[in-house]
Every structure is written in C-alpha cells, then in structure tokens.
Amino acid sequence: KIGSDSVMVRISPSRMMGGLYELPDKMAILEKLLKEFDLCGLRQLDLSCANSNYFETSGKVIRKIKKFWPHILIGGASLTIEEAENEINLGYLDMVTWGRAILANPNFVELVEKGLPLKEFDNSMRESLI
C-alpha cells in the first residue's frame, strides 16, 4: 500500500498560456488546499509555474506559503544552479526540479559538477523524444 508519506503533489497556481495566467484568489485557495493536504498526511509539494520566471511567479508564492506549509517544498525549474543553491540555502526550497534543463542537457549532472554552462531549452528538443 502506498501511503501519503510516499506521495508528492504538483500544483501550478500560475502558468504561461498565451501570457501569464494566475489562479484567481490564488493565496486564499492555496492556504485552504494546503491545509487539506496537511490533514491528509501529504508532506511533499512541488509548486510549478512551468515556462515562467520563478521569481515573478512560483518564487513569490513559495515565500508566502512557507508560513503555512512546513513540509517538503520543491520547485524552481527555471532557476540557474546558483539561484537554486541560494533558494535552498535561504530555506525557501528543499529541493529543485529541472525538467527542460535536463532535456536540453542530457549530460546535466556532468555540466553542473564541472560548472559548465547549460544549453537553453528549445521546444524543438521535444521532437527527439518521440
């Protein structure tokens, strides 16, 4: 049996969809939703605002929800390595998730370990996955 301690929930209160779309009454909804997640025993949350600037979207939300979400918080897909380290060191994120960066850089770990620059993701890179 898979328990709530083995489940991570991913939510997207902001998205790039022909421009930035943000959930109406975002903070009120998130506060209620996260309290319910907590009551269910969920302890891992991935806050994704895919294809948008972290500091303009999920970074702002993360700073607010830390007050009522004391559990594992994951996010930051658009962050650089240095920005990600800073968000973790400041206690805003527990883990950083990179998807597009890994697709663009199959040798992601090696590049990060050596401090080498990462290629920018381009939507055409998705074609090689099919």
Predicted features along the sequence, with ranges:
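Flavin-dependent oxidoreductase catalytic cores
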Residues: 1-130
